[in-house]
Amino acid sequence: MLRRMIEFQDLCLDVTDVATAAAFWGPALGLRPDPERPECLVDGVPEHSLWLNVVPEPKTVKHRVHLDVHVAAVSDLIGLGARVLDDSQRWTMLADPEGGELCAFVRDPGTLRDYRLYEVVVDSANPAAIASWWAERFGVPVQHGTDSDGEVSWLEGAMGPEIEFVFAAVPEPKTAKNRLHWDVRGDVDELVAAGARLLRRPDDDISWHILADPEGNEFCVFPRQ
């Protein structure tokens, strides 16, 4: 039996304008702004929450972490303000209103769930190694394969039922802070001992720890409830 060291909590996206981001990502994911915290998009399931974190810097490089979503039609996302970047694959790559990449997978409308997230995809130097590292932390199996772009590894069940956590090979190194990251609940010392790097401790501005995984992907750690 695999031991679960951490539990998935939610996702966070850096944005320059909350209202613009919420108007796109709310309908795109089947979420709505929390009446008391409009920067948090919710649907009643805590793990589905997407926090929109305002940052001063705009997007400058391709997102190394992006979301894949289920759609009835790509035009639904275009109507929300997205633009098509590449439609040559069985999925369509788009940019959201702030330029952040996402991929849309068209489904039969009768099969669509209210919550539209399909996958969280992470560009990786070594997909097999980093996926295995996260699989050990989440206590779930890891699977390895290839797609049209090369090596790919993925976890099922780490971020909730029917959501895949995917690591895909890319040649370029990470050069900037990821604008999309995930939050987990767990023990910071255990994670550091396993190879994570501590970036920031709780201080006057934050009550959580910020860490980076062995490939430098930022994530936040909260105490277990």
Question: How would you label these PLM feature ranges?
Answer:
Residues 1-37, 42-86, 95-149, 153-205, ...:
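Glyoxalase I/VOC metalloenzyme domain signal
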